[in-house]
Amino acid sequence: MIVTKLKSFFLALSTVCILMGITWGIDHWRRKAPDEFVILGKVPNFCLTDQHNQSICNKDFKGKIWVVDFFFTSCPTICPVMTANMVAVQNAFPDNSIGIASFSIDPEEDTPEKLQEYAKEKGITSPHWHLLTGDEETIYELANKGFNIYAKSGNTPTEFEHSGLFALIDTQGNIISRKRKDGNPIFFYKGTEKEGITMLIEDIKKLKKQSLL
């Protein structure tokens, strides 16, 4: 009788331990998943106008995974490559579940009408991809201090300067980066290189999976 009770006790104890182990494993994975990324800072506040002449603010991306870049429609160098690669990112998520904010660094020329033409020409179809224009000083402040992605104005298309980098934003409004093998962040994703786009798409998928937990 005592032996039977002891067996029942140890069986129950084993079951509890297994369940605790499974629970710990799930919880550990949830805590560990964000460690794949480094938080670089919070998204700055902004309200600008998109290609549909609608006011778009950072709060409109709340709860979404989104990507940021800086460009201008008359850019003769890296912008066509950047936009084509961003279209590839858009097309990797046909459910339109991610957001994209492309800030024009030539807002005087890039009116909502011109941005809408550019969107049609380049295959921009996602309702959550906003080509943004507005106050020039505000946009350069966002580029150089808000997102820390370099941009410099010019008088002609060849005089404008900007990086080809893409920034990744999580659902909490954090600017994030994946870690290199040495544990240091890559900071941003190279929007002109296939490898950078591949990494970006991989990391968006990881964030999407994490957000479902």
Feature-to-residue mapping (PLM):
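Hydrophobic alpha-helical segments, especially N-terminal targeting/anchoring helices
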Residues: 49-50, 169
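N-terminal targeting signals for export/organelle localization
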Residues: 1-47, 207-213
